[in-house]
Regions:
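Structural recognition of the conserved hydrophobic beta-strand(s) that form the central parallel beta-sheet
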Residues: 102-103, 125-131
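N-terminal pre-Walker A segment at the start of P-loop NTPase domains
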Residues: 2-34
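Hydrophobic positions on the alpha1 helix immediately C-terminal to the Walker A/P-loop
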Residues: 56
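Short glycine-rich substrate-engagement loop in P-loop NTPases that contacts/grips substrate
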Residues: 69-96
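Interdomain hinge/linker elements that couple catalytic modules in large macromolecular machines
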Residues: 2-15, 158-244
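Conserved P-loop NTPase "ATPase switch" module shared by AAA+ and STAND
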Residues: 93-112
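Short regulatory helix/loop adjacent to the ATP-binding pocket of P-loop NTPases
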Residues: 134-154
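Conserved lysine of the Walker
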Residues: 53
Length: 244
C-alpha cells in the first residue's frame, strides 16, 4: 500500500468539503430528534447502504456543526487508509484547532478504533457513519474484525430506510391507500425515491454487491456471486437449494 502524504491528504479533505458545498443536505429524518448532544462518547450512525447515512451526516455538518472537521473515507483516493495515515490526519486535525470531527465511513480505514479512542481521550468530539455490520458488532462489544473487545467509547444509533411518514413528507403526498401502494411499489431507499430512476436501483445493487460483498468479504469469484445474487432476487419467496 502506498502511503498518502500529509499534503495530499490535506488537499483531498479540502476538496471533499468544497464538494459538499454544492450538494443539497437532504431531507430531514426522524432520527434527528433522538440524536444526543455530543459528549465524551463517539456517536456512530449505522445502517444499510442507501439508507441515507451520508446525507444525514451532511445535514448535521450543515445545520449543527458547520465549523467541524470533515473527512469522507468512502472515497477511492483514501483507499487503504491505515494507522500511518491516521498519524497525518491527527496532525492536520490538531493544526486546524477544531474540537469536533465528522467522518463518513471511518470504519473503512484500518486502525480507526485506536485513532478515535485517542482523540476522544484528548477531548475531541466525534460523529461518524459506519456500516450496519460494524454497528451490530460494536453493539455486542466486538471489534468489526472479530479480534477482541472494544473500548467503551461509543454511542450507537441505527438509521433505517424511509418510514411511511418520511415517505409522505418527502413526496408531499396525503396519507391513504394510494400513498401506501406507492410506498410499497417504490420502496424506502431515499436516493431511489428522490430520482425515481431504475438506473439508481441498478447502481445501488452494484455497490452492495461489489463494495459490501466482494471487496469487504474478500470474495474472488465475483461472477459466480453475481449469478447467485441474481438468482436469489428473481426467485424471492421460492425455495432455494445449494445445487439449484
Amino acid at each position: 500500500t502506498v502511503m498518502i502524504t500529509k499534503t495530499a491528504l490535506e488537499n483531498i479533505v479540502s476538496k471533499q468539503r468544497k464538494m459538499l458545498a454544492n450538494v443539497s443536505p437532504g431531507h430531514p429524518r426522524e432520527i434527528e430528534e433522538s440524536i444526543p448532544y455530543l459528549t465524551d462518547r463517539m456517536l456512530l450512525i449505522g445502517g444499510v447502504r442507501g439508507c441515507g447515512r451520508s446525507a444525514l451526516l451532511h445535514r448535521m455538518l450543515n445545520n449543527d456543526y458547520p465549523e467541524a472537521w470533515y473527512t469522507d473515507f468512502d472515497d477511492p483516493r483514501l483507499g487503504g487508509f491505515d494507522a500511518g495515515d491516521f498519524t497525518k490526519l491527527d496532525r492536520l486535525l490538531e493544526e486546524s484547532g477544531k474540537g469536533i470531527a465528522l467522518f463518513n465511513r471511518i470504519d473503512l480505514a484500518a486502525g480507526w478504533i485506536e485513532f478515535c479512542d485517542r482523540k476522544i481521550r484528548q477531548g475531541i468530539k466525534i460523529v461518524s457513519t459506519v456500516s450496519l455490520e460494524t454497528l451490530l458488532r460494536l453493539a455486542k462489544a466486538e471489534r468489526p474484525d472479530g479480534t477482541g473487545a472494544v473500548p467503551d467509547i461509543f454511542s450507537l444509533r441505527r438509521l433505517d430506510l424511509f418510514s411511511y411518514n418520511e415517505f409522505l413528507s418527502f413526496t408531499h403526498k396525503p396519507a391513504g391507500e394510494q400513498a401506501v401502494n406507492e410506498f410499497l411499489s417504490r420502496g424506502a431507499f431515499p436516493g431511489l425515491i428522490k430520482t425515481g430512476h431504475t438506473e439508481a436501483l441498478h447502481q445501488l445493487y452494484t455497490e452492495i454487491l461489489c463494495k459490501d460483498a466482494v471487496i469487504a468479504g474478500g470474495i474472488r469469484d465475483r461472477n459466480t456471486l453475481q449469478r447467485m445474487a441474481l438468482h436469489l432476487i428473481t426467485n424471492t419467496g421460492e425455495p432455494v437449494t445449494a445445487n439449484k
